[in-house]
Amino acid sequence: MDHLPIFCQLRHRACLLVGGGDVAERKARLLLEAGAALTVNALAFAPQFKAWAKQGMLRLVQGEFNASLLDDCWLAIAATDDDAVNNQVSEAAEARRIFCNVVDAPKQASFIMPSIIDRSPLMVAISSGGTSPVLARLLREKLEALLPQHLGKVAGYAGQLRRRVKQTFTSMSERRRFWEKFFVNDRLAQSLANDDEQAVTRITETLLSEPLDDRGEVVLVGAGPGDPGLLTLKGLQQIQQADIVVYDRLVSDEIMNLVRRDADRVFVGKRAGYHCVPQEEINQILLREAQRGKRVVRLKGGDPFIFGRGGEELETLCDAGIPFSVVPGITAASGCSAYAGLPLTHRDYAQSVRLITGHLKNGGEFDWHNLAAEKQTLVFYMGLNQAAAIQEKLIEHGMDPQMPVALVENGTSVKQRVVAGVLTELGALAQRVESPSLIIVGRVVALRDKLNWFSSK
């Protein structure tokens, strides 16, 4: 380890920044956020420095660097475009045993500035030791996506509760269990983010007063249509907090690779070598694991409330008194149509869109007359086996036999394939694709060649 990570308390402590340009301005902003008593020395200053000085936030010393400016300083930063001046500052600081950072010259510096993720009071610092600042920045961007913006409020509120929690729960194990429930309580986190004091108080009192049983919870998460980049940030956060993930065939391998490595995985879909797990058995798996105290994520392709049976699963949990929450996902109709260059609505072609399941319960029948109307787009989920019947019924009820149609196979993934034609060909086209595929019927399909942007294998 070439550098020891430390966090400095600089509030009201004297610090010197040498430089008055854009780079120095960025360093000044960080020092001011940390509460430093900042002096800035330069031959000339960018306008922002003058504005800060006018507000009394820092002191400006215009002119050549003089080592006496380091007197009584705790920390210094050299951020000029003159290597000789930067070296002069570094040597003067070293002689006084003052830590000094030299921008873009880590070998001359006694400390380096990391990339920072600020969720005050929670702080995350990332450094490559000065060898690759771009890599550190890219890692910071990835972590920024994982850490919710409201995390700082949660951490700050936890600090306020520490004494009361210690008084309420006498044993270390009880306090640990309380904090585990506290930090994964999504309702509390959202209430803190919204500054909803009444809700925060109500949830806190419930957490403090209810028995510390081993009851877990279930989070229903929509994984989106396939491309892992379309998984929502909240969905990603939830699957990385899960003790167990119950998933089906429509969840891509790329998304499953994002699951916490030590989490249990239970596959409940249907594919080669596996039998489809009945819905009632899935419901019982969720219930059983939550009753064991697990944080369960039920991960479904697309959006769990659009032909995903999410409501059925939650009813079982609700009846059993198991806490649950829902993270919506991008449904297949939205994701697959976008990646296939097919706008679902368009002023000239479609003023509405209908999402339709290819499976009706107990032999039910669609309202084919209204489905055959113009100026709309039809999207059939799970409709491959019914494609010939869909073709026949739509034509029978008056739809133009030359209505454009498209089938999107493995939409949004690198395996995406789009097969297009007209309504009279729908049954035959369905024989050329495999599940999972989406059927799209409407005039908007004619725009595909013009609007297609996604390159796939």
Swiss-Prot record:
S-adenosyl-L-methionine binds at residues 225, 301-303, 306, 331-332, 382, 411. It catalyses: uroporphyrinogen III + 2 S-adenosyl-L-methionine = precorrin-2 + 2 S-adenosyl-L-homocysteine + H(+); precorrin-2 + NAD(+) = sirohydrochlorin + NADH + 2 H(+); siroheme + 2 H(+) = sirohydrochlorin + Fe(2+). InterPro entries: 4pyrrol_Mease, 4pyrrol_Methylase_sf, 4pyrrole_Mease_sub1, 4pyrrole_Mease_sub2, CobA/CysG_C, NAD(P)-bd_dom_sf, Siro_Cobalamin_biosynth, Sirohaem_synt_dimer_dom_sf. Residues 1-204 are annotated as: Precorrin-2 dehydrogenase /sirohydrochlorin ferrochelatase. NAD(+) binds at residues 22-23, 43-44. GO terms for biological process: cobalamin biosynthetic process; methylation; siroheme biosynthetic process. Keywords: Cobalamin biosynthesis, Lyase, Methyltransferase, Multifunctional enzyme, NAD, Oxidoreductase, Phosphoprotein, Porphyrin biosynthesis, S-adenosyl-L-methionine, Transferase. Residues 216-457 are annotated as: Uroporphyrinogen-III C-methyltransferase. PROSITE patterns: SUMT_1, SUMT_2. Pathway: Cofactor biosynthesis; adenosylcobalamin biosynthesis; precorrin-2 from uroporphyrinogen III: step 1/1; Cofactor biosynthesis; adenosylcobalamin biosynthesis; sirohydrochlorin from precorrin-2: step 1/1; Porphyrin-containing compound metabolism; siroheme biosynthesis; precorrin-2 from uroporphyrinogen III: step 1/1; Porphyrin-containing compound metabolism; siroheme biosynthesis; siroheme from sirohydrochlorin: step 1/1. HAMAP family: Siroheme_synth. NCBIfam families: cobA_cysG_Cterm (TIGR01469), cysG_Nterm (TIGR01470), PRK06136.1 (NF004790), PRK10637.1 (NF007922). In the N-terminal section; belongs to the precorrin-2 dehydrogenase / sirohydrochlorin ferrochelatase family. Then it catalyzes the NAD-dependent ring dehydrogenation of precorrin-2 to yield sirohydrochlorin. Finally, it catalyzes the ferrochelation of sirohydrochlorin to yield siroheme. This is Siroheme synthase 2.
